[in-house]
């Protein structure tokens, strides 16, 4: 996954005349701040046999780039027919390449097929030799971009953040959600166990209540509380008695006089 990702590309004027400029509405997403601008470029492939006939129709620097979703319109000039091997090479199918680079490093390229046809001429019924003999009138040539089927190629580059990982994004807090779900399940199990224990205790109390009468229940409760209080009182009394015994023992013990040497 790249820091900059193209979300959509809309061809605004399609079909159009060969001499009309290209117009693209580009929407992309930026995940982190960028120090430099993005360089967008549109290239026209003038010949299928040699890259020397490729034409850079236009370049555009876009920046500064804020984090989030951004949209702009990229307009590029039409190809220069004087730079083509032959004028007849205008006709037929060719390719345009929309690319983006960061600090001279290309990281994405979108390719489109383009079909150029001249009015009153059916190229499908002609072979290559016949097409090369056609006297081309640029004012009658129309282009049609196959915008529905772009070919996207991505390249890994070094961004500003050296710690940025191009691997697919990990779902945030996935482990925490699993831990929370497990904790909730454990709490539910503990609650169910606690309710079961309470029910068992209530059943035991109910059995005891059934064996005795109401007066007996009240007497038992009172005795239990009195016994607890008595136990506490006995402990305090024992502590007081032990303290008094120690004090009386200290008083009864005669003082030892130090021996004197004669």
From Swiss-Prot:
Superkingdom, taxonomy of origin: Eukaryota
Gene Ontology MF, one: histone binding
Record's GO cellular component terms: chromatin; nucleus
Residue spans of biased composition, Acidic residues class: 173-219, 226-242
Keyword Transcription: yes
Coiled coil spans: 173-196, 223-253
Keywords: Chaperone, Chromatin regulator, Coiled coil, Nucleus, Transcription, Transcription regulation
Segments of this protein annotated with the region Disordered: 157-262
Primary location recorded for the protein, binned into one broad class: nucleus
Biased composition (Basic and acidic residues): 250-262
BP terms from Gene Ontology: chromatin organization; DNA replication-dependent chromatin assembly; nucleosome assembly; nucleosome disassembly; transcription initiation-coupled chromatin remodeling
Localization in the cell: Nucleus
Record-linked PANTHER family: ANTI-SILENCING PROTEIN 1, HISTONE CHAPERONE ASF1
Function summary: Histone chaperone that facilitates histone deposition and histone exchange and removal during nucleosome assembly and disassembly.
Homology family: Belongs to the ASF1 family.
Quaternary structure (record): Interacts with histone H3 and histone H4.
UniProt-recorded name of the protein: Histone chaperone cia1
Taxonomic source organism: Schizosaccharomyces pombe (strain 972 / ATCC 24843)
Designated gene of the protein: cia1
